[in-house]
Amino acid sequence: MMDINEIREYLPHRYPFLLVDRVTDLDFEAQSIRAYKNVSINEPFFNGHFPAHPIMPGVLIIEAMAQAAGILGFKMLDAKPADGTLYYFVGSDKLRFRQPVLPGDQLVLEAKFLSRKSMIWKFECRALVDGKPVCSAEITCAERSL
């Protein structure tokens, strides 16, 4: 549905912090998105987390979910960062980690719009590997004009 070139239009992040490789489903009626991140042993964070037992840092799993939610928010607004709007990750609730994410995994990212109050957006997010949840959270983003 969205390749990396289009994703780069909707996210201001760049290597090594762009954590969405492809969007496979964007459902405006359900206000949801499904995307993925291919986790390679070549990711820079594996050099230090942890060299003998590499696992993806939890904060980056949360960030990947927030980036997927950000794409959904931009699409719902029909806006892009180039238009002068950004989403800032400002918090999470009900955060749970269930299992580690390892090199070679495909991290599936799901986000569903929950609410918007003024410029504060809430999304219900999940990250899965092989159909099993590895992380879930309610992600809060702030919409800001540049």
Curated annotation (Swiss-Prot):
GO molecular function terms here? (3R)-hydroxyacyl-[acyl-carrier-protein] dehydratase activity
Pfam families referenced in this protein's UniProt entry, alphabetically:
FabA
The first-level EC class reads lyase
User: Its catalytic activity?
Assistant: a (3R)-hydroxyacyl-[ACP] = a (2E)-enoyl-[ACP] + H2O
The cross-references to InterPro entries, in alphabetical order and at most eight, read:
FabA_FabZ, FabZ, HotDog_dom_sf
Return the GO cellular component terms, semicolon-separated: cytoplasm; membrane
- UniProt KW keywords: Cytoplasm, Lipid A biosynthesis, Lipid biosynthesis, Lipid metabolism, Lyase
A GO biological-process term: fatty acid biosynthetic process
Compartments reported by the entry: Cytoplasm
Entry EC number(s) = 4.2.1.59
Q: Does the keyword Metal-binding apply?
A: no
Which residues constitute the catalytic centre?
49
Protein family (similarity comment): Belongs to the thioester dehydratase family. FabZ subfamily.
Q: What is this protein called?
A: 3-hydroxyacyl-[acyl-carrier-protein] dehydratase FabZ
The source organism is Pseudomonas putida (strain ATCC 47054 / DSM 6125 / CFBP 8728 / NCIMB 11950 / KT2440)
By which gene is this protein encoded?
fabZ
